[in-house]
Amino acid sequence: MSNQELKTTMSKSIEAAQRNFNTIRTGRANTSLLDRISVEYYGAETPLKSLATITTPDSQTIAIQPFDLGSLASIEKAIATSDLGFTPNNDGKIIRINVPPLTEERRKEFCKLASKYAEEGKVALRNIRREAIDRVKKSEKDGDLSEDQSRDEQETIQKETDNFIKDIEKKLSEKEAEILKV
């Protein structure tokens, strides 16, 4: 695995962690809160964002305007039964969701969830590091790399891993600050 391939693979783990962070409520309306919602539409689970236009008219409201008004009830049901805790308001054309301010208790829960997502990202990075180091050790064992080259490669891999872990920790602290901001 080249250094560039390693960075690309690790970047994908960072992006996955960031996507997870984006699904955490912060007390402000954000369209990415609805990214994980799937709607039963003509017998198939369909992502909400492919069935409707999702906008944030103000900082406390999310508006969902379906392309097909026949899907309105299904969208409303999917939002109501999701784990987000939102109550959708259906006016026959648009579904509005009021995003209530977070209580202190909910803020702490969301910080724990963000920490969990960060830890999952770090574990993924460590697994990538382990695989890369195993490949280097195998190359050394097969005689493709000298002992010094192997050590240098392993140090480079470790430095890259450390940089990416710092990146996740930075994103986590930013998300926690955003969650705790009243």
Curated annotation (Swiss-Prot):
Signal peptide: none
GO biological process: translational termination
Key word Glycosyltransferase present: no
Cellular component, GO, one term: cytoplasm
GO molecular function, one term: ribosomal large subunit binding
Keyword Protein biosynthesis carried by entry: yes
Protein location: Cytoplasm
Residue segments, region Disordered: 136-160
Main location: cytoplasm
Role, per record: Responsible for the release of ribosomes from messenger RNA at the termination of protein biosynthesis. May increase the efficiency of translation by recycling ribosomes from one round of translation to another.
Similarity field: Belongs to the RRF family.
Protein name stated in the entry: Ribosome-recycling factor
Gene responsible for this protein: frr
